[in-house]
Amino acid sequence: MKNENILVVKREKLFPETAFQGLVASGTQALLEIINREKEFKPRPLMEEDSAYKQIIPYLLFKYQDRYFLMQRKSTNTDQRLKNKYSLGIGGHMRQEDLGNGDSIFDWGKREFHEEIAYSGNLKMSTLGILNDDSNPVGHVHLGLVLLLEGDSEHIKIRSELKSGQLLTALEIQKFYADLETWSQIIFDAILNPLKTEKANQKQSSSVY
């Protein structure tokens, strides 16, 4: 693990009362304002063990038409808790130098995407929500800003730190569900779950008649 200063925010500043659990789409802008106002930069090794702080992680999903980019982490991943896991998200820690020259978290997110992924098409970015999961040691010290990158090209491949990647439909991704990292499972359940989508479509169709 690198000994670098990363962006963190005190838990009590993010959650003055009870912390929500899961992926929440509402209130994203308010939390971003808190992050910008209360952000600190502290040594990563210390923060991995300090639950008084949340490490802010932009977590980017790539989508092309009806397919999402599913990746598998290397067994040599720097965080041993995530090795060999499958992931829907591209992300990482933010350092002080990453946010220089007036750059935003979103600017950093696009740079991080292009550092890890070889992709030459156009991208449209949108915010899906904030993800919090205190049910395990990894999630307890991290907070995810979940972003969706929609591309106009299917030509995409892994550049660094991740082992493999492929574009799959939600139904195909479901086969890997047990091996998805926890954040990706939460996102799958909230957004991609084909059974949930099918029920919503059936409900919408029945309301037409």
Language-model-derived ranges and their functions:
Residues 2-6:
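Extreme N-terminal starter segment of soluble prokaryotic enzymes
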Residues 7-12, 44, 84-97, 129-134, ...:
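Nudix hydrolase/Nudix homology domain
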Residues 1, 51-54, 139-141:
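A short catalytic or substrate-binding loop motif that flags glycine-/basic-rich loops and adjacent residues
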Residues 14-20:
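Short N-terminal binding/cap micro-motifs at the start of the first secondary-structure element
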Residues 120-129:
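A short coil-to-beta-strand element that immediately follows conserved catalytic motifs
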Residues 67-112:
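Conserved Nudix-box catalytic region and its N-terminal flanking loop in Nudix hydrolases
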Residues 21-67, 73-77:
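Acidic, metal-coordinating catalytic segment for phosphate/diphosphate chemistry
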